[in-house]
Regions:
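NAD-dependent ADP-ribosyltransferases
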Residues: 1-230
Length: 230
């Protein structure tokens, strides 16, 4: 028997909403057809409400004396062994010796995304240039059903609410907010909740050189939990 896909839901929202085009809304409900995008797609999109060239990144600055910076950087890398393998140790030591401020930009690997919102707002929907909205009446069962359809492409999924904040900040061991749910402050009206599927790839100091392609999946089971709001 196949192992069921893993899907973690942090908050069980009573309802979620998907802004879309009318033609796609009909396909979701009538055919169970869903388009699952990717994080790196948003880096290439120029649409005001959608595109973000810094999607999936998070920056850290290391302050203090060279000894303090070296200690904090060591802690930083211990929790990110994949990053340690990708950085140039000699260049780092030279920067510390020259008293040059140290910073890293962390890139999460490309991931599959299905973006929704926990609060319906028709004005925001129009900002997305959408003319339809799907109400997801049971987000937990919807997410589990869609995750089943995504099983061939990604083994693990989670539902997370986006946090609208600055991507760059001083290093702090408690500053563990994942890069894949950070969005700029000017988009906080979106109130986005993401379904994220990961294929357990590494975190990078540069962009993922093997980006994913969007998927079209079928799930009439997921469609059962959708109804047309607009």
């Amino acid at each position: 028997m196949d192992k069921k896909p893993l899907f973690h839901i942090g908050i069980n929202y009573p309802r979620l909403y998907k802004y879309t085009k009318a033609e796609f809304a009909d396909k979701m409900i009538n055919e169970g057809t869903f388009r699952i995008g990717t994080m790196y797609e948003y880096r290439l999109t120029t649409a005001k409400e959608i595109g973000d060239p810094d999607e999936g990144t998070k920056g850290y600055s290391f302050l203090g004396t060279p000894e303090e910076q070296r200690s904090n950087i060591d802690v930083f890398f211990r929790s990110r062994p994949d990053l340690r393998r990708n950085h140039n140790a000699s260049e780092l030591e030279q920067s510390l010796a020259d008293n040059i401020p140290i910073g890293f930009v962390e890139h999460c690997p490309d991931q599959y995304l299905y973006c929704t919102t926990h609060t319906f707002d028709e004005t925001v929907m129009r900002h997305f240039e959408c003319d339809a909205c799907i109400e997801i009446i049971n987000p937990r069962f919807f997410a589990e059903s869609l995750s089943e359809a995504m099983r061939p492409y990604a083994p693990y999924g989670t539902m997370r609410e986006c946090v609208y904040t600055n991507r760059w900040g001083d290093w702090d061991q408690q500053n563990n907010l994942p890069a894949d749910i950070i969005k700029p402050l000017q988009l906080q009206h979106q109130k986005e909740v993401r379904l994220i599927w990961s294929s357990a790839r590494e975190v990078f100091l540069g962009a993922d050189l093997d980006p994913l392609e969007h998927k079209i999946v079928k799930s009439m089971q997921a469609a059962r939990y959708c109804r047309r709001l607009i």
